[in-house]
Amino acid sequence: MPDLPFTFTLPTPELIPSHYDNHIQRRLSALKGQFLDEKAYAEMLEREDTLLYEVYEIKRPQAAGELLTGISVVHPGKVGGEFFMTKGHFHAVLETAEVYLCLKGEGFMVMENPEGECVVERLAPGKVLYVPPRWAHRSVCTSRQEDLVTFFIYPGNSGHDYGTIEQQGFRKLVMDSPAGIVIVDNPRWNKK
């Protein structure tokens, strides 16, 4: 990877980078234990291991001073009443932040820190979201037919800690209801 300035484009309507180094596809099976309705999860997985989201990474060295960038695409859909979402993560270097720019679609960023504070922010095109150090974060697509597409940037040495979220999930869930989209407490969170 050359140490030179570079550019890339995000051609519309897909907004997939003109250049990327890694394409990650996360399917339903990768989020085992993360959806509230375990029966709906099992039934859906039995039918098909549905593609929930994709990440297009533009790699840089995993070193202080570098910035890693990319595009996250969360597809529309639900497991039971819960919208499709990313796995969510803390950074392995907890004291590192991340910035997201929503390019397309609608959704939420669910965030929490180890001290128990929770914040859920709405995402819509043009909205910039700053995730401070120490905050786990997960993107949730609430669009009915449109992908939630975000551009992200974070320090090269931050790494990812998916394991903590896999063990206990997030404290808040984004659910569909007859009254519309609701943010609810995760009833299983304290049981883990």
How should these model regions be labeled?
Residues 1-15:
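N-terminal capping/interface segment
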Residues 17-121, 140-192:
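Active-site region of the double-stranded beta-helix
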Residues 130, 136-138:
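Hydrophobic beta-strand signal
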